[in-house]
């Protein structure tokens, strides 16, 4: 590839260079085949994510975490969370105009938050609560490895795009205000949603 493209000046669009690379390296037929396959997999992935988010919002609405009237609604004929499906689609349509960095900002932030708390929860649950801190193996599995994981994720936090941090703080602030309203200034317990097998 370095022989074909010694630097990015040869690309018409450096942010979307894959189709150009495939055209020059393998020809138009290969380029079309990969682009069609990529389109199908993106649509399948998007449909699965759309359905998953809609159903999660339904469960949260059903259990009172979100307003039940809207989020807990199920279409009587199709048995789908229709309002949630439409809401997710409307938000997805708003994202069409976003550039790649802005569109991936909340995903990057969400992943880093999740991975950080997964590591911290291992320490909290096993090393502190269950007191699995007697042997060297316990210290290694339930303290050292999760701390290493949290530090590794911490290195990624340092390199996070500024737009991700700003969007994350805004999103977190909205969530905090919503939780304060739902719990009447944190005097009532936070609503929990229940898994139904």
Curated annotation (Swiss-Prot):
Q: Which named protein is this?
A: Probable low-affinity putrescine importer PlaP
Keyword Transferase included in the entry's annotation? no
The entry sums up its family as follows: Belongs to the amino acid-polyamine-organocation (APC) superfamily.
Compartments where located:
Cell inner membrane
Q: Give Gene Ontology CC terms.
A: plasma membrane
Q: What is catalyzed by this enzyme? A: putrescine(in) + H(+)(in) = putrescine(out) + H(+)(out)
Q: Name one GO biological process term.
A: amino acid transport
The molecular function terms in GO held by this entry are: symporter activity
Query: What membrane topology does the UniProt entry give?
Result: Multi-pass membrane protein
Task: Name where it mostly resides.
Answer: membrane
What's one Pfam family here?
A: AA_permease_2
């Amino acid at each position: 590839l370095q022989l074909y493209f010694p630097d990015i000046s040869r690309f018409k669009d450096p942010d979307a260079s894959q189709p150009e690379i495939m055209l020059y390296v393998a020809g138009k037929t290969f380029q079309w085949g990969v682009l069609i396959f990529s389109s199908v997999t993106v649509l399948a992935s998007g449909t699965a994510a759309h359905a998953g988010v809609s159903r999660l919002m339904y469960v949260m609405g059903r259990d009172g975490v979100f307003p039940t009237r809207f989020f807990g609604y199920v279409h009587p004929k199709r048995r789908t969370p229709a309002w949630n499906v439409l809401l997710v689609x409307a938000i997805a349509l708003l994202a069409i105009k976003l550039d790649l960095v802005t569109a991936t900002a909340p995903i990057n932030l969400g992943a880093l938050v999740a991975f950080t708390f997964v590591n911290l929860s291992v320490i909290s649950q096993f090393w502190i609560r269950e007191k699995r801190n007697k042997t060297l193996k316990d210290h290694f599995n339930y303290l050292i490895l999760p701390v290493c994981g949290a530090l590794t994720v911490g290195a990624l936090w340092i390199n996070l795009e500024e737009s991700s941090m700003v969007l994350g703080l805004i999103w977190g602030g909205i969530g905090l205000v919503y939780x304060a309203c739902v719990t009447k200034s944190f005097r009532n317990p936070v609503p929990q949603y229940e898994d139904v097998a």
